Amino acid sequence: MSVNGPIDASLLRIVRDRTGAPETAICRAYESDASFRAACADVRICFRAQRRWEAADSSRAPALAAEYAELLEDLAEELRRILKPEP
């Protein structure tokens, strides 16, 4: 285990579901790569915000939930790039 510690189960599930990457690859990257950890932190924040807007009773809620969904996909793509660097 590194000084940063392992990824928690809820974040692991979110990242796995968004990237399709194996849990072992996600755990390794989380423990060894600061940019991956930072992107994971952004994913967690974005995921929570999207869920809040999906549950919100506001005329703006659907548009904001959609914006967060799009941002979440962009972040997932960033995580996939980190997990599978170009040859």
List the model feature ranges, each with a label.
Residues M1-P87:
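Extended, charge-rich alpha-helical interface modules
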